[in-house]
Amino acid sequence: MHLLIAAAGSGKRMGANCNKLLLKVAGRSVLAWTLDAVKRSNSISWIGIVGQPSDKEAIVSIFDECALQAKWINGGDSRQESVQLGLEGLPLDAKHVLIHDGARCLVEPELFDKCSEMLRQGVSVIAATPVIDTIKKVSLDGFINKTFNRAELWAAQTPQGFNVEQLRQGHKKALVNNWTVTDDASLFEKLGWPVKILESSPSNIKVTTPFDLLIADALLSSRGAD
């Protein structure tokens, strides 16, 4: 299976002056923990890392540390643009691709394998977890105007897996129609293309804020203790 790792983000919401994937958590970089899970999966045979040129040296050194090989792909100004560029960097024979946020360092290796299996069966798939909080829609002036049915709500995660050619077609349509999406499942949704949910662990968080870093540190440290 081909895997694209999104690593072109910044550390703005983290309050850091560097890419959050380079920050230390439980003694290692965020990205190193993610790569450790990739390495322990059974399905990943090719890795592309989509990042900013300014981070290339640091990120490549983490791959060396983890004894993994990857193709470097320069990312864009948004996640959407970075995925487009990542698709251009895939090998010509790539039929399926998993896309994973490099900041989801708590991902379990088996999740890559389960997504890969569904994808090989012809099913577009995303990892997700049921929402446990009650979700409110709020007006601009702060008043509640709708409560959603929690039973129908899932929090989207990664990996997300798609047929390569179909995903390329989707991104072309997005460019033509000037659509902006925050993940590729949203793009498929706009086009009416089915995507299946694969339930994953609530621990598969995206490390985005200082609080996330504390949670990740505690969970990764506890895994080591076990």
From Swiss-Prot:
Its EC number is 2.7.7.60. It is an enzyme of class 2 (transferase). CDD domains: CDP-ME_synthetase. One of its GO terms (molecular function) is 2-C-methyl-D-erythritol 4-phosphate cytidylyltransferase activity. Keywords: Isoprene biosynthesis, Nucleotidyltransferase, Transferase. It holds the Pfam family IspD. The record marks R150, K206 as: Positions MEP for the nucleophilic attack. The record marks R13, K20 as: Transition state stabilizer. Pathway: Isoprenoid biosynthesis; isopentenyl diphosphate biosynthesis via DXP pathway; isopentenyl diphosphate from 1-deoxy-D-xylulose 5-phosphate: step 2/6. It catalyses: 2-C-methyl-D-erythritol 4-phosphate + CTP + H(+) = 4-CDP-2-C-methyl-D-erythritol + diphosphate. It comes from the Bacteria. GO terms for biological process: isopentenyl diphosphate biosynthetic process, methylerythritol 4-phosphate pathway. PANTHER family: 2-C-METHYL-D-ERYTHRITOL 4-PHOSPHATE CYTIDYLYLTRANSFERASE, CHLOROPLASTIC. Catalyzes the formation of 4-diphosphocytidyl-2-C-methyl-D-erythritol from CTP and 2-C-methyl-D-erythritol 4-phosphate (MEP). Belongs to the IspD/TarI cytidylyltransferase family. IspD subfamily. HAMAP family: IspD. This is 2-C-methyl-D-erythritol 4-phosphate cytidylyltransferase. The gene is ispD.
